Amino acid sequence: MKKTNKRPDGRKFQKGGKPFRSDKGEGRGRMNNKKKGSVNAGLDRKVLVEPHPRFPGVYISRGKEDLLLTRNLVPGVSVYGEKRVAVDLEGMKVEYRVWNAYRSKLAAGIVCGAENIHMEPGSKVLYLGASSGTTVSHVSDIVGKDGVVYAVEFSERSGRDLINMSMKRPNIVPIIEDARYPSRYRMLVPIVDCIFSDVSQPDQTRIVALNAQYFLKEGGGVDVSIKANCVNSAVPAETVFADEVNILRKNSIRPKEQVTLEPFEKDHAMIIGRFKLSASEEKRQSSQKKD
């Protein structure tokens, strides 16, 4: 299993190590040089937007700052006050949303060097621990109109925000339920391509494994964001991560990568793997990487 604790290409997504700025909840203050609640969706000819080299549906803007982006599924609408960038693409205005790694564990995993998040246009994703939908909205952008995000959130308060957001995004299915009991929403979720989990519970790895048994296709992707202190605050973070990896292995999930999420999140790691990957399939994938 590959462990990563630095960005793969050495490029910075924030000059001077400064975070992207946003104006709500989990964010780190206001947007740079913008009043609270403002966005910038004007046509910017100085910004070059290019596809991310590893992740279909994810983009990078090259300008004064390098920013992680997703193409807005609902142009003209922001979800949580995020900055929007519009560029001219062959005579057509295309709008992108800035994806802040300080507000999204999945974005942090990408910036910190993950090689595969198992999501792309057309994917079906089961998202556990959806909260109010900040990261869910970007996954919605990634999978696009042909994909679906099944977003599970237990909190009724966050669930209301999630439902309101999903009204404008038809590819999100909000599920206000406890992820520890997947049988309660088994009639709503089909077989999916990937499970992403950001559930802050001591048994979060077991929760992921249980949902995988219900909903994840054979060979499907598993992305687990782990906060060490939520699992066991009495031992070092690396010990916690190693224990969680072993739990995944015992539940037919083969870890492939472990990515630390610092400096975006302290004592966090993302473990990325495959579910019930057969020996022949693993050999085929290994040979493809060598080629």
Curated annotation (Swiss-Prot):
The gene is NOP1. One of its GO terms (molecular function) is rRNA methyltransferase activity. It comes from the Eukaryota. SMART domains: Fibrillarin. It comes from Encephalitozoon cuniculi (strain GB-M1) (Microsporidian parasite). Residues 1-12, 20-29 have a biased composition (Basic and acidic residues). It is an enzyme of class 2 (transferase). It is found in: Nucleus, Nucleolus. Residues 1-45 are annotated as: Disordered. It catalyses: L-glutaminyl-[histone H2A] + S-adenosyl-L-methionine = N(5)-methyl-L-glutaminyl-[histone H2A] + S-adenosyl-L-homocysteine + H(+). Component of box C/D small nucleolar ribonucleoprotein (snoRNP) particles. The modification Asymmetric dimethylarginine is found at residues 28, 62. Signal peptide: none annotated. Its EC number is 2.1.1.-. The keyword Ligase does not apply. This is rRNA 2'-O-methyltransferase fibrillarin. GO terms for cellular component: box C/D methylation guide snoRNP complex; nucleolus; small-subunit processome. Keywords: Methylation, Methyltransferase, Nucleus, Ribonucleoprotein, RNA-binding, rRNA processing, S-adenosyl-L-methionine, Transferase. Transmembrane segments: none annotated. One of its GO terms (biological process) is box C/D sno(s)RNA 3'-end processing. Belongs to the methyltransferase superfamily. Fibrillarin family. S-adenosyl-L-methionine binds at residues 134-135, 153-154, 178-179, 198-201. The keyword RNA-binding applies. Its main location: nucleus.
